[in-house]
Amino acid sequence: MAQALLVPPGPESFRLFTRESLAAIEKRAAEEKAKKPKKEQDNDDENKPKPNSDLEAGKNLPFIYGDIPPEMVSEPLEDLDPYYINKKTFIVMNKGKAIFRFSATSALYILTPLNPVRKIAIKILVHSLFSMLIMCTILTNCVFMTLSNPPDWTKNVEYTFTGIYTFESLIKILARGFCLEDFTFLRDPWNWLDFSVIVMAYVTEFVSLGNVSALRTFRVLRALKTISVIPGLKTIVGALIQSVKKLSDVMILTVFCLSVFALIGLQLFMGNLRNKCLQWPPSDSAFETNTTSYFNGTMDSNGTFVNVTMSTFNWKDYIGDDSHFYVLDGQKDPLLCGNGSDAGQCPEGYICVKAGRNPNYGYTSFDTFSWAFLSLFRLMTQDYWENLYQLTLRAAGKTYMIFFVLVIFLGSFYLVNLILAVVAMAYEEQNQATLEEAEQKEAEFQQMLEQLKKQQEEAQAVAAASAASRDFSGIGGLGELLESSSEASKLSSKSAKEWRNRRKKRRQREHLEGNNKGERDSFPKSESEDSVKRSSFLFSMDGNRLTSDKKFCSPHQSLLSIRGSLFSPRRNSKTSIFSFRGRAKDVGSENDFADDEHSTFEDSESRRDSLFVPHRHGERRNSNVSQASMSSRMVPGLPANGKMHSTVDCNGVVSLVGGPSALTSPTGQLPPEGTTTETEVRKRRLSSYQISMEMLEDSSGRQRAVSIASILTNTMEELEESRQKCPPCWYRFANVFLIWDCCDAWLKVKHLVNLIVMDPFVDLAITICIVLNTLFMAMEHYPMTEQFSSVLTVGNLVFTGIFTAEMVLKIIAMDPYYYFQEGWNIFDGIIVSLSLMELGLSNVEGLSVLRSFRLLRVFKLAKSWPTLNMLIKIIGNSVGALGNLTLVLAIIVFIFAVVGMQLFGKSYKECVCKINDDCTLPRWHMNDFFHSFLIVFRVLCGEWIETMWDCMEVAGQTMCLIVFMLVMVIGNLVVLNLFLALLLSSFSSDNLAATDDDNEMNNLQIAVGRMQKGIDYVKNKMRECFQKAFFRKPKVIEIHEGNKIDSCMSNNTGIEISKELNYLRDGNGTTSGVGTGSSVEKYVIDENDYMSFINNPSLTVTVPIAVGESDFENLNTEEFSSESELEESKEKLNATSSSEGSTVDVVLPREGEQAETEPEEDLKPEACFTEGCIKKFPFCQVSTEEGKGKIWWNLRKTCYSIVEHNWFETFIVFMILLSSGALAFEDIYIEQRKTIKTMLEYADKVFTYIFILEMLLKWVAYGFQTYFTNAWCWLDFLIVDVSLVSLVANALGYSELGAIKSLRTLRALRPLRALSRFEGMRVVVNALVGAIPSIMNVLLVCLIFWLIFSIMGVNLFAGKFYHCVNMTTGNMFDISDVNNLSDCQALGKQARWKNVKVNFDNVGAGYLALLQVATFKGWMDIMYAAVDSRDVKLQPVYEENLYMYLYFVIFIIFGSFFTLNLFIGVIIDNFNQQKKKFGGQDIFMTEEQKKYYNAMKKLGSKKPQKPIPRPANKFQGMVFDFVTRQVFDISIMILICLNMVTMMVETDDQGKYMTLVLSRINLVFIVLFTGEFVLKLVSLRHYYFTIGWNIFDFVVVILSIVGMFLAEMIEKYFVSPTLFRVIRLARIGRILRLIKGAKGIRTLLFALMMSLPALFNIGLLLFLVMFIYAIFGMSNFAYVKKEAGIDDMFNFETFGNSMICLFQITTSAGWDGLLAPILNSAPPDCDPDTIHPGSSVKGDCGNPSVGIFFFVSYIIISFLVVVNMYIAVILENFSVATEESAEPLSEDDFEMFYEVWEKFDPDATQFIEFSKLSDFAAALDPPLLIAKPNKVQLIAMDLPMVSGDRIHCLDILFAFTKRVLGESGEMDALRIQMEDRFMASNPSKVSYEPITTTLKRKQEEVSAAIIQRNFRCYLLKQRLKNISSNYNKEAIKGRIDLPIKQDMIIDKLNGNSTPEKTDGSSSTTSPPSYDSVTKPDKEKFEKDKPEKESKGKEVRENQK
């Protein structure tokens, strides 16, 4: 590859394409064709050379090719890619060096490549302006498409657009040709789009087709053309299409699961949602007289009356009239009801009747399969599902909650997250591919450098021979060198014109130089910029190193990490193609950084953090050198006159940083230390070129050397110039005006200011100011007093002043030039300027929004808060990566918005009365572009169903369904999941660990550290004085030789920093060191000394955890009180593994936990008290040897054995469950059930006593120390305390006290005690506890992030949500009646000035509002209020403030998409961390070992089973053969599927005939399945019931038969019997193994199976949380007013109802509705005096604070944490499952092996005869299959044999496995392990002693054969002698030709005795396997024969 690239660089590589070129190509092609025979041409596809990826059409020319000569721009050139050397193509390049490839055949049969017309077309096509023009046209066209009612003149504009598009296509067709050859117009799929758009335009124009607007919508596709024009978008769309392809399996699985659930729904709820409450007809109507006939089933299916006595009452009309149904206020649909006991009941005077249409315009139902499927899809995407849930439960009964639980957990969580998992994996693969490509390119580049180096060496050798040398001194010489190089090779990286300019400049300069030489020496500053640039480039031509002492204009980047890519058009792409590894040593550098190990470019994602952080700098991408490193951290030895010193930023990139006068010239050229004159500099510079001058004499050598130099020079130059973003004049300007160093006095001032401003304490002060300022801003609220608001104003002024002062001082200290080099400073500057601007404009109306900019100050916290920094970085990274994706998303949204507007806009206008009673457009419509956009955005947020109903009602079902489903699937499921995948990928642990920006500790920590140090110092001094005063000899622990110190962890954030800054900085910006508990001593680890970590196992390395998370705590600050404790802590510390760059803090195990985890050797209780106690109170220590002490000790031992006994634990668990269950009975009916109440009271006392007893026993048994150091014991202790307190209070009669009552609610925590007792839940909880620090961190960051939006909301909407409502109707007054507050008050009692419940009146309320918006629940009301708001004290007007929607859109994107998904990221990340910590075995395995290990794991778990013997009876045998065939299985599956289809056809309102037909068909199926059952029973006999699936079939068949006869009865008492048919679908799972194509789906199901145990644990935990919250809810919200989401079925009155509500909120659905009534705190919203019959409670008001806390905490716990754990498990297992399926051997392969084995070993002896082995190997499926002829391979496997020539199954399997996986050293160890496991799982395994092996046996056989043959030969010779003497006599007579005869005899003899005949019989002895029955033995024998002979030969040769 590299050769191919390197051969032609230089101008000669570009050759114009001429007729000769074409002829040459044709000639080459013909030659090649002649060379290759036809066959080979077909076969060669695999090994064909591939086109060079760098020279693909559309890419830019790699700049190794240099410039295109101007005369060749836009001209046809010969193809550069060797791949096309004999293809008819040519290339054209435009000025931007983009490559266009064309076919060299005639376009449209007439235009040859050299035809002038075609040439002009090509010139136009490749010109950059052409694509610009098209792009502008498309954008303008898009703008015109958004007009809903375009004016008439737009018609002409349309024609213009069509004209331009036609012109574009014509040009393309003329230039490229139409469609026959490669690279023609229609060969590019994007052009199909153009073509169809143009054709459509003309068709709609000239042919009048009915619905033109539908066709006009196709114009929207023009927006897609932007994709084809913008290069980056094509790749993203590629990725999207890839992920959609990958989604096919998930889609199939999803559709299948949804169909199954839809069928179940269809059977369960068909027709239920039409049950309504009908008013009893008036008593005098004819209805009363025949009531009975209505309810005795005389209604036919249409609800009309069947022959009843002639009456005037028309039942059909009566139920058809909607006014007779019971409708709740504010609802569109009538109230549903059900006839079950637990279904919804009707009010008095109403009956429950099935009539009318379904809810929501009739679209929500389970009446037909299609509607049921839609309902299920809606459940899966969880959109407004609470509505469906409530309707269904109300109509069918609460028990059906189980159906929803299943669908939500298995359907929704699992399937939706599978989609996410697949998209994420597709993205990950795409990413890997690009990374690999980049690495490959880098390797290629390295290769090229090597080649250049070789060429250079050769050149030098040539040059050395030549004697003459030319004096080469002075810059002029250099100029000439460079000049000649440019002439010799136009390999420059800039265009020729630039070269000319440069040359001109250089000549002028040389001219000047001659005159101004003296001046130049004395004034180095004025050196012309260009020459410096020329000369500053020192590079040694060594492939890996490039030394430069060049200072760049930006301190963050430097030459050493060249971020441009050699061959890719993206200059700033993340993965640079090559990186120069640099070593730079500089005058003032503190350290000599030599880092050749890591390339500076390596992507942070691509490498895990190394354990030895201090050793590496090459970790994160590009980061800023902090300003502190610029000035305050100068090395003490440096004078302040600004000599350079270098800092190494995190990439190992050396940036030269210096004081104010560091820049000695505009580009920062620095003369090396000690050089006085320029000549020296020049000499040094030239010497480093390393190109010997002699060689320049030899012209060819000179040319070559120069071209080498110029290649590199130009590469560098281009780089450097790309770095210098501005023209040189700006640098001169900057030098004069932006760098202030005029006089010494000023420099002193500057130095002083510098010292002050850069001090860490100032940073701390500023941070505190930021926090205070944020608090001040957050204190705004409505209504505010004058005084308060003036305080806030003054505060704002003060803070603005402080920040302005900070900025001014920093500018003085650092110079504007340097100040603005750093991101944070620019950010500060912008904020300060905005604040000042806002002060000036504060009185201007409408500019109050500027105040919101102050909020950005909050982000300054990120500087010192790593997690916030990380979040901003992640958002930054993602936004970078998401740039293109966002564009794609925007295009998709745009297209759908326009499509919606074009298709449905008119319908909304015309049919609006169908969806709105007052015939005005609803808020969500598609009549104009903005509203259309909002609807599409809402669909992306996952809310599609409600807007779709409206659409279907006004514009017809099919179109709406198609459009909405497309938006949903493409936009929401694919693109948004890609978003999430990107987020998760930028969330790799590296980003988490490497939070700090540079290798500096941030100033805050230094400041806090200093304070800590001061405090410690004071403490120590005081302690010393104290000790001197009171004790003579202080007790000091002697620490010997530091060996005990070794293992103690260092203070986590490394605060001890000496003044000389000699601490070590590691990659995380924290100091790594090892020290004692709180001693000041630090072990500074030398970088080169890191090996000691490895060699000294007692040394624990703490890899610091992201700073800031550790809260600067010292990990073990407790003073060690004794040697033993020190030892103990040492052991503990060694046991804990510090997290590796994780977000998990290291938690030291406490003593109690240790007691739990370590197996006890002997049953001895631990010490009662801690050693500290015993020291202070010596009487606590009792001798256990005699007297009372001994009795006490024995008592403790007894207690210990009781407590440790299993039964005790079981009993306690039982008690916990009972006591928790008892809590569930305390609902609102407890007062009426007196007996239960008294029982519960007694039970409560009993439980309390039992728990107290348990606690006392544990105290005695474990001792206080153990008990109180265990977290679970503390939990028990606190819960028992609560019970105890309430018990005592009851006894004293204080039970009615408020405090005691609230304490009683804490009893709800009792179930928590079950946590520690259930292993599964404990695991989950431990994982959660581990994640708490990082979850908290993310929560905090989210709060900060949201704070900004909340304050902004307060600024925008505080007090503006108030409105005036009519008290009687509850409706809002129109603005014509009431305009403001005073108008409303004037109306008196009938009106009320009321606020929206969830509002933005203060920051707290704002948070709640934002949470509702972020979870998309209740957000509509908030948005409507915001959009309608006008101003404080003014009545709102409909959509007055329309663009406020954008505030919410922006918040949803940042606040919801980003921050909420961060939770998933953090939890997944934590999961991986935890797994690394605990499941350590995987980490220490190589990939190879893992493969073997996994294969063995699967292998060990299987063993050969006895197959079901074939019956002896002939008839049974035939049936057996029929039944055990695969075909039989598959046909049964097809029947099952057909059965499903017939079930799908059922509908609620089908006719009688249809019902009859379906029942007959069902009968047929039952007969068929019964037939299957009978056949299997006959053939398999009693073995039938040994297989699980068969039992399943049997049960289903029996149920179906029973169901047929007893259908009515079963339906009455149980569920509909048709459900059993659905269950049959489970059998499809069996068939998946047989279908090769279903591997993907199998993987998905396998992932689900793997996840189940974990999901079960998480489910348990969720249930526990729900249980606790349900009890809490019952005790607090049982009596609230029934409104919004709380009604007679969904409430907190009973335990069941609470659980139903909480399950609904688990997915955050409808929590706003449940919260609304609880927010009613005073009249007139609720009545505090309502009487509740049967209970003593008064009033129905809620408690807002408790309610908000209850719901918000529940949502955070369940929706954000537990449900995300569920997601994390699925993602994790999906990736594991995909890995497994990618492994060479899967479970199925082993299963298949054993299945085939059963046929060859019917008695399960575990042995097989050697003779059968060949057939066995051939009968397997790949990959284990060894096809015939396979004897040689099998013998070569050297399998051990036992007596009787038998081989054990394990040996065979092992050998075959080895063959698949390849040889490996680890096999033997694994083999032994595996045999042990096999023996363990198979006690029946015969222990056998192999007596020989196949290879040995064969050798023996062959040896025998050779002996035999030789002996025969001997016999033969003897006989020949005899025969020949007889023959000789005859020969003389008959002249027989003797030699022929002799041959014949020998043949004859040979034929009689084939030595290997015995072998041939092998195949006949095998049992009737599938193969052996089908092939006649003879054929097999023939096949094996030649093989045997060849084998014999081989072996013979070997033996020789």
UniProtKB/Swiss-Prot annotation:
Protease as UniProt keyword: no
IV repeat coordinates: 1508-1806
Basic and acidic residues bias spans: 46-57, 510-528, 596-610, 1974-2000
Function: Pore-forming subunit of Nav1.3, a voltage-gated sodium (Nav) channel that directly mediates the depolarizing phase of action potentials in excitable membranes. Navs, also called VGSCs (voltage-gated sodium channels) or VDSCs (voltage-dependent sodium channels), operate by switching between closed and open conformations depending on the voltage difference across the membrane. In the open conformation they allow Na(+) ions to selectively pass through the pore, along their electrochemical gradient.
Spans of repeat I: 110-455
Residue ranges with Basic residues bias: 500-509
Top-level taxon in the UniProt lineage: Eukaryota
Keyword annotations of the record: Cell membrane, Disease variant, Disulfide bond, Epilepsy, Glycoprotein, Ion channel, Ion transport, Membrane, Phosphoprotein, Repeat, Sodium, Sodium channel, Sodium transport, Transmembrane, Transmembrane helix, Transport, Ubl conjugation, Voltage-gated channel
Resulting phenotype, P1333L: In DEE62; prominent gain of channel function, with markedly increased amplitude of the slowly inactivating current component and a leftward shift in the voltage dependence of activation to more hyperpolarized potentials
GO molecular function: voltage-gated sodium channel activity
Tissue expression as described in the entry: Expressed in enterochromaffin cells in both colon and small bowel (at protein level).
Extracellular side stretches: 147-152, 207-213, 270-369, 387-397, 780-787, 843-846, 905-929, 946-956, 1227-1238, 1293-1301, 1357-1402, 1420-1442, 1546-1553, 1606-1617, 1678-1699, 1713-1744
Outcome (variant: I875T): In DEE62; prominent gain of channel function, with markedly increased amplitude of the slowly inactivating current component and a leftward shift in the voltage dependence of activation to more hyperpolarized potentials
Protein's name in the database: Sodium channel protein type 3 subunit alpha
Gene3D superfamilies: 1.10.287.70, EF-hand, iswi atpase, Voltage-gated potassium channels. Chain C
Intramembrane segments: 370-386, 930-945, 1403-1419, 1700-1712
